[in-house]
Amino acid sequence: MPRVKGGPVTRRRRKKVLKLAKGYFGAKHALYRVANQQVMKSLMYAYRDRRQRKRDFRKLWIARINAAARQNGLSYSRLMHGLKLAGVEVNRKMLADLAVNDQAAFAQLADLAKANLNK
């Protein structure tokens, strides 16, 4: 049986993998088999972490809102409940931005939440 040489399709596939592995350390950027394993693992990490990033940002926003809420005499949960009772539909991303960049506006929202909690 004759030996099968790597044709254009195989070469193209291997070049594509090695291109994705560019910048990896050691053999992982140069040897096809090791590079292929690392590229597969990297793609799995990328898929997982695209979902994780959404959770991480939500945690960050909540931490920022909680810190600002406590400066205004409320806990995070009471602030959110008060805003919901007031009919304010501001998402966590916008609230966190207000907490960092416009503390006066955040304080007004906190006062509104306090007023609606006491009703």
From Swiss-Prot:
<keyword id="KW-0699">rRNA-binding</keyword>
<dbReference type="InterPro" id="IPR049946">
    <property type="entry name" value="RIBOSOMAL_L20_CS"/>
</dbReference>
<dbReference type="InterPro" id="IPR035566">
    <property type="entry name" value="Ribosomal_protein_bL20_C"/>
</dbReference>
<comment type="similarity">
    <text>Belongs to the bacterial ribosomal protein bL20 family.</text>
</comment>
<dbReference type="Pfam" id="PF00453">
    <property type="entry name" value="Ribosomal_L20"/>
</dbReference>
<keyword id="KW-0687">Ribonucleoprotein</keyword>
<dbReference type="InterPro" id="IPR005813">
    <property type="entry name" value="Ribosomal_bL20"/>
</dbReference>
<dbReference type="GO" id="GO:1990904">
    <property type="term" value="C:ribonucleoprotein complex"/>
</dbReference>
<dbReference type="GO" id="GO:0000027">
    <property type="term" value="P:ribosomal large subunit assembly"/>
</dbReference>
<keyword id="KW-0689">Ribosomal protein</keyword>
<dbReference type="GO" id="GO:0005840">
    <property type="term" value="C:ribosome"/>
</dbReference>
<keyword id="KW-0694">RNA-binding</keyword>
<dbReference type="GO" id="GO:0006412">
    <property type="term" value="P:translation"/>
</dbReference>
<dbReference type="GO" id="GO:0003735">
    <property type="term" value="F:structural constituent of ribosome"/>
</dbReference>
<comment type="function">
    <text>Binds directly to 23S ribosomal RNA and is necessary for the in vitro assembly process of the 50S ribosomal subunit. It is not involved in the protein synthesizing functions of that subunit.</text>
</comment>
<protein>
    <recommendedName>
        <fullName>Large ribosomal subunit protein bL20</fullName>
    </recommendedName>
</protein>
<dbReference type="GO" id="GO:0019843">
    <property type="term" value="F:rRNA binding"/>
</dbReference>
